């Protein structure tokens, strides 16, 4: 598979990658709204920002589950590639650094691509974005994950609804299964059926299991009803 590795010169992590001399695809657009579409899959490196400023290495898919948009289009999810994201995440989790390693729920753009896009991010401030040792370690682990994608074991292909934005549950499930879109609890009440269906259908690998994390009865019933046309196992947590 032709997997393109991408960075943006408008992003501090991208500038660090360029300084380190990696021969990846270079763009100058905002990472949340870029239009690069080459290859059969795209892995883009970028900064991660959070109010808590917790040092972190994260992976996630792009997509806007509601009308609220940060790049891309409203109520549109990107294409997930569970086997690839999980292979990368498993390698990141092996990094011997005292830094949080986690999967984030699907958020922000772009949503224009008809190939899967995976974000690999470093948080949460300039100290980490420009740290050449950390950036190099993350990039090299990502490359290992890409190299191992075809041998990645997936007990199930899982999409998720509920839980926090930084999901310990789905990060843990990735040890044995491969993870598609995760829609956090913050968006659940704003979802329409089309987005719920996209969370299953927009995937390179066929999703065979949905995990619903800590949602109330009304929220669970609505998601289950939207997925009634799918032959899929639903697990409540």
From Swiss-Prot:
> Source species, please?
Saccharolobus islandicus (strain L.S.2.15 / Lassen #1) (Sulfolobus islandicus)
In the record, what terms sit under GO molecular function?
Answer: D-aminoacyl-tRNA deacylase activity; zinc ion binding
Gene name as annotated: dtdA
Q: Enumerate the UniProt keywords alphabetically.
A: Hydrolase, Metal-binding, Zinc
InterPro entries attached to this UniProt entry: Deacylase_DtdA_archaea, DtdA
Could you give a single Gene Ontology term from the biological process aspect? Answer: D-amino acid catabolic process
Q: What is this protein called?
A: D-aminoacyl-tRNA deacylase
The answer to whether UniProt assigns keyword Transmembrane helix to this entry is: no
Catalyzed reactions = a D-aminoacyl-tRNA + H2O = a tRNA + a D-alpha-amino acid + H(+); glycyl-tRNA(Ala) + H2O = tRNA(Ala) + glycine + H(+)
The cross-references to HAMAP family, in alphabetical order and at most eight, read: Deacylase_DtdA
Domain of life the protein comes from: Archaea
The entry's free-text remark on the cofactor is: Binds 2 Zn(2+) ions per subunit.
Record-stated family:
Belongs to the DtdA deacylase family.
Q: What do we know about how this protein assembles, alone or with others?
A: Monomer.
